[in-house]
């Protein structure tokens, strides 16, 4: 990946986590051709949102760090170079914003305090250390901790913050007019409407390498979705995973759990935490079953051929589990929908799944019956043509009078010329 960034570059910044059975690497792509990747310490945990967190990193530690050769030079040349309190090159401050965006701050703070309630962090901290040690050194995080992190909506903060997707939502005894008063309480939660397909990857060093660990699939919004385990060596997936419709499809796994979340989030006064509690009970059972499956297949770790031979079995088990759970989801969805209808609530997943700017076509106006054709008025007979008046004969041409002979010209009398002078 680093080679691709060096050769091709990156149009934007991103964070990538790469892991296998031996180690986990955290990589910040700093845009352009710059990047820094570090090996995650085995005794640390990290909570990170959509921003940069790496502070000072020893770029010469080639065993634990992979970085672009000009990462520090480019920051200096661009004028964005920043240092920590000890004068060392600070990656996040040099390549990221001066302050955390509010949505990044709220999620980072919520995640740290959820996983480590005794942590000394505050909401106003200038920066959050990326790799952290739990206050309790004996703390071991579980799958359920990871699920809870993805779903969290500030429940553990005792009302200090409210998810900002609740702005304008009527609360008991409140018509929404208190939104302005509670402005500072509304924050961007970890479990928000934009967090979809937030899976959990469990790397198990005791499984055959070809299994690739376990993917705890969380289709749909993380707020109210169940996590279901699948190995990475499946040869096929259940039919409900295959529809690719852009709006609600009752045969789709994604759209079914999306609808369940949609009903739960828009009717919290009805469902409260019951949906999450239902999934948590289901997940406890799935974790027990998955541990038994892991114990069965770990015997094949050092036998690649035997591990490959059970791929059909693993696939069949996954298809059977998917079918069973999907039928349960459909039943649960139907019960929630029926309950809302009984309460007189509206619930139309087809309409709700359409984009906000979608407008239903206006119904066609009913065709008006044509007015009966009025009979044409009878044609009035034309008036009889008046006979033309007889042409009066032209008067006879009178003969011209005979030309009289000219009188003989009398000779002119000569008169003397008189001249008058005008005054």
Language model feature labels by segment:
Residues 3-28, 33-362:
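C-terminus-biased signal that marks the final domain/tail of proteins
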